[in-house]
A protein has these predicted regions:
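Cleavable N-terminal signal peptides
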Residues: 5-6, 16
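N-terminal signal peptide c-region/cleavage motif recognized by signal peptidases
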Residues: 11-15
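Short helix-onset patch at the extreme N-terminus, typifying the N->h transition
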Residues: 6-8, 61
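Acidic, Ser/Thr/Pro
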Residues: 18-125
Length: 125
């Protein structure tokens, strides 16, 4: 019985596993490469202040669902929300002081490789 309980305990994190990466800026730049397992997701998150502009670009080995979101109480706001895209780019102009997450959901049965690049810009640039 103990072995079964231990195996179940070890299996649970694999079932709910998702990658959440904290943005660590390096001279106003952030880059990250990851492989998203089938039916899992990747989030890249960091604090932004109202008026901050972040240029973003990503490329995937296959399409995934992509969004940029932040939480307001129990609600979720989506400044960007795209379905079934393999690459995209744009600029987030932060509407409020908040933690923002760039998120990719892999709904396929194959792993998807993602490469993302973020660049901080001064407001108005």
């Amino acid at each position: 019985m103990r072995i079964a309980a231990l195996l179940l305990t070890l299996a649970i994190p694999a079932v709910v596993h998702a990658d959440i990466v904290d943005i660590k800026w390096n001279d106003g730049m952030f880059s990250h490469k990851a492989s998203i397992a089938p039916k899992k997701f990747l989030e890249v998150c960091g604090k932004q202040k109202k008026g901050d502009n972040v240029g973003w670009q990503f490329k995937g080995s296959a399409p995934s669902d992509f969004n940029i979101h932040y939480h307001v109480g129990k609600d979720v706001a989506y400044p960007e929300n795209r379905k079934d895209v393999a690459s995209a780019d744009g600029t987030l102009s932060a509407p409020v002081d908040q933690d923002y997450c760039w998120m990719w959901s892999n709904r396929s049965v194959q792993a998807v490789d993602i490469e993302v690049n973020l660049k901080q810009a001064k407001p108005g640039k």
